[in-house]
Amino acid sequence: CGLFNGLGITLLRMPHPFIMTLGTLYIFRGTGNLISGGTPISGFTDEVRYLGHGRIDLQWLGLEKSQYLPVSLVLIAIVDIIFWIFLNHSKTGKWIYAIGGNPNAARASGINVNKILVIVYSLCGFLSGIGALILAGRTDSGYPNAGLQSELDAIAACIIGGASFFGGRGTVL
Protein backbone atom coordinates (compact mmCIF):
# COMPACT_ATOMS: atom_id res chain seq x y z
CA CYS A 1 0.00 0.00 0.00
CA GLY A 2 2.76 2.42 0.91
CA LEU A 3 4.67 1.78 -2.31
CA PHE A 4 1.45 2.28 -4.28
CA ASN A 5 0.81 5.59 -2.50
CA GLY A 6 4.38 6.77 -2.98
CA LEU A 7 4.40 5.97 -6.68
CA GLY A 8 0.95 7.49 -7.15
CA ILE A 9 1.91 10.71 -5.40
CA THR A 10 5.20 11.12 -7.26
CA LEU A 11 4.18 9.90 -10.72
CA LEU A 12 0.71 11.45 -10.81
CA ARG A 13 1.97 14.63 -9.11
CA MET A 14 -0.98 14.74 -6.75
CA PRO A 15 -1.61 18.28 -5.47
CA HIS A 16 -1.85 17.00 -1.90
CA PRO A 17 -0.77 13.54 -0.70
CA PHE A 18 -3.76 13.40 1.65
CA ILE A 19 -6.07 12.96 -1.35
CA MET A 20 -4.09 9.98 -2.63
CA THR A 21 -3.74 8.27 0.73
CA LEU A 22 -7.41 8.75 1.61
CA GLY A 23 -8.44 7.44 -1.81
CA THR A 24 -6.25 4.35 -1.54
CA LEU A 25 -7.56 3.75 1.99
CA TYR A 26 -11.01 3.18 0.53
CA ILE A 27 -9.66 1.16 -2.41
CA PHE A 28 -7.69 -1.22 -0.17
CA ARG A 29 -10.46 -1.40 2.43
CA GLY A 30 -12.92 -2.37 -0.31
CA THR A 31 -10.47 -4.93 -1.70
CA GLY A 32 -10.08 -6.44 1.78
CA ASN A 33 -13.84 -6.70 2.10
CA LEU A 34 -14.11 -8.37 -1.31
CA ILE A 35 -11.37 -10.90 -0.55
CA SER A 36 -12.74 -11.78 2.88
CA GLY A 37 -16.39 -11.58 1.96
CA GLY A 38 -16.76 -8.98 4.72
CA THR A 39 -16.15 -11.56 7.43
CA PRO A 40 -13.26 -11.81 9.88
CA ILE A 41 -10.43 -14.20 9.04
CA SER A 42 -9.14 -16.28 11.94
CA GLY A 43 -6.85 -19.20 12.63
CA PHE A 44 -3.49 -17.47 12.58
CA THR A 45 -0.24 -19.21 13.40
CA ASP A 46 1.20 -19.26 16.89
CA GLU A 47 3.88 -16.76 15.80
CA VAL A 48 1.26 -14.16 14.86
CA ARG A 49 -0.65 -14.77 18.10
CA TYR A 50 2.64 -14.35 20.00
CA LEU A 51 2.99 -10.82 18.59
CA GLY A 52 -0.31 -9.86 20.19
CA HIS A 53 -0.36 -11.97 23.34
CA GLY A 54 3.26 -12.94 23.99
CA ARG A 55 5.08 -11.81 27.10
CA ILE A 56 8.75 -11.59 27.95
CA ASP A 57 9.57 -12.65 31.50
CA LEU A 58 11.77 -10.12 33.29
CA GLN A 59 12.85 -12.50 36.04
CA TRP A 60 16.35 -12.64 34.52
CA LEU A 61 16.77 -9.04 35.72
CA GLY A 62 16.83 -10.32 39.28
CA LEU A 63 13.32 -9.26 40.21
CA GLU A 64 11.85 -11.11 43.18
CA LYS A 65 8.47 -11.41 41.55
CA SER A 66 7.91 -12.54 38.00
CA GLN A 67 7.03 -9.52 35.87
CA TYR A 68 6.40 -9.38 32.15
CA LEU A 69 6.62 -7.04 29.21
CA PRO A 70 4.29 -7.52 26.25
CA VAL A 71 6.13 -8.63 23.10
CA SER A 72 4.24 -5.96 21.15
CA LEU A 73 5.66 -3.23 23.41
CA VAL A 74 9.21 -4.55 22.98
CA LEU A 75 8.75 -4.80 19.20
CA ILE A 76 7.42 -1.25 18.96
CA ALA A 77 10.28 0.05 21.15
CA ILE A 78 12.84 -1.67 18.91
CA VAL A 79 11.23 -0.24 15.76
CA ASP A 80 11.16 3.23 17.37
CA ILE A 81 14.86 3.06 18.24
CA ILE A 82 15.78 1.87 14.75
CA PHE A 83 13.79 4.64 13.09
CA TRP A 84 15.11 7.28 15.50
CA ILE A 85 18.65 6.28 14.55
CA PHE A 86 17.68 6.20 10.87
CA LEU A 87 16.11 9.68 10.93
CA ASN A 88 18.76 11.37 13.04
CA HIS A 89 21.98 9.69 11.97
CA SER A 90 21.65 8.81 8.30
CA LYS A 91 21.90 10.87 5.16
CA THR A 92 18.48 9.65 4.03
CA GLY A 93 16.95 10.72 7.35
CA LYS A 94 18.36 14.22 6.92
CA TRP A 95 16.98 14.28 3.38
CA ILE A 96 13.54 13.34 4.70
CA TYR A 97 13.58 16.35 7.03
CA ALA A 98 14.85 18.57 4.20
CA ILE A 99 12.06 17.45 1.87
CA GLY A 100 9.49 18.02 4.61
CA GLY A 101 10.81 21.52 5.20
CA ASN A 102 11.00 22.62 1.57
CA PRO A 103 10.83 20.10 -1.28
CA ASN A 104 11.86 22.68 -3.88
CA ALA A 105 15.01 23.62 -1.95
CA ALA A 106 15.76 19.93 -1.39
CA ARG A 107 15.38 19.27 -5.12
CA ALA A 108 17.63 22.26 -5.92
CA SER A 109 20.30 20.89 -3.57
CA GLY A 110 20.44 17.62 -5.50
CA ILE A 111 18.15 15.38 -3.45
CA ASN A 112 16.04 12.98 -5.49
CA VAL A 113 12.76 14.03 -3.86
CA ASN A 114 10.55 11.52 -5.67
CA LYS A 115 12.78 8.59 -4.73
CA ILE A 116 12.85 9.61 -1.06
CA LEU A 117 9.07 10.11 -1.03
CA VAL A 118 8.53 6.60 -2.41
CA ILE A 119 10.87 5.24 0.28
CA VAL A 120 9.02 7.15 3.02
CA TYR A 121 5.58 5.98 1.90
CA SER A 122 6.87 2.41 1.54
CA LEU A 123 8.25 2.51 5.08
CA CYS A 124 4.90 3.82 6.33
CA GLY A 125 3.17 0.90 4.63
CA PHE A 126 5.65 -1.51 6.21
CA LEU A 127 5.03 -0.06 9.67
CA SER A 128 1.28 -0.26 9.11
CA GLY A 129 1.76 -3.93 8.28
CA ILE A 130 3.61 -4.49 11.56
CA GLY A 131 0.76 -2.79 13.41
CA ALA A 132 -1.77 -4.94 11.57
CA LEU A 133 0.10 -8.12 12.52
CA ILE A 134 0.15 -7.08 16.17
CA LEU A 135 -3.59 -6.31 16.07
CA ALA A 136 -4.34 -9.60 14.31
CA GLY A 137 -2.30 -11.45 16.91
CA ARG A 138 -4.08 -9.65 19.71
CA THR A 139 -7.59 -10.32 18.42
CA ASP A 140 -6.74 -13.64 16.70
CA SER A 141 -8.60 -12.39 13.66
CA GLY A 142 -8.15 -10.20 10.65
CA TYR A 143 -11.26 -8.07 10.66
CA PRO A 144 -11.73 -6.34 7.27
CA ASN A 145 -13.33 -3.28 8.85
CA ALA A 146 -10.79 -2.83 11.64
CA GLY A 147 -10.12 0.85 12.10
CA LEU A 148 -13.31 1.87 10.32
CA GLN A 149 -14.10 5.54 10.97
CA SER A 150 -10.91 6.08 12.96
CA GLU A 151 -9.25 8.31 10.36
CA LEU A 152 -10.24 11.50 12.18
CA ASP A 153 -8.98 10.08 15.48
CA ALA A 154 -5.59 9.37 13.89
CA ILE A 155 -5.35 12.86 12.41
CA ALA A 156 -6.37 14.45 15.72
CA ALA A 157 -3.79 12.36 17.60
CA CYS A 158 -1.05 13.57 15.23
CA ILE A 159 -2.07 17.20 15.64
CA ILE A 160 -2.38 16.96 19.42
CA GLY A 161 0.97 15.14 19.49
CA GLY A 162 2.59 18.12 17.78
CA ALA A 163 3.03 16.90 14.20
CA SER A 164 3.50 19.76 11.77
CA PHE A 165 1.29 20.05 8.71
CA PHE A 166 4.10 21.97 7.09
CA GLY A 167 6.80 19.29 7.46
CA GLY A 168 10.48 19.66 8.12
CA ARG A 169 10.36 18.70 11.76
CA GLY A 170 9.16 15.84 13.87
CA THR A 171 10.31 12.86 15.87
CA VAL A 172 9.69 9.15 16.01
CA LEU A 173 7.72 9.62 19.21
Named regions from a protein language model:
Residues C1-L25:
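Alpha-helical transmembrane segments within multi-pass membrane transporters and channels
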Residues L3, L7, I81, G125-L133, ...:
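Hydrophobic positions within alpha-helical transmembrane segments of bacterial inner-membrane proteins
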Residues L3-L12, L34, I85, H89, ...:
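Membrane-interface helix caps of multi-pass small-molecule transporters
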Residues T10-M14, K91, F165-L173:
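Membrane-helix interface "capping/anchor" motifs
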Residues P17-W95, I116-I119, T139-P144:
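Transmembrane helix-bundle core of multi-pass membrane transporters
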Residues V113-G125:
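Start (N-cap) of specific transmembrane helices in multi-pass transporter permeases
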Residues S122, S128, R138-L173:
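Transmembrane alpha-helical segments in multi-pass inner-membrane proteins
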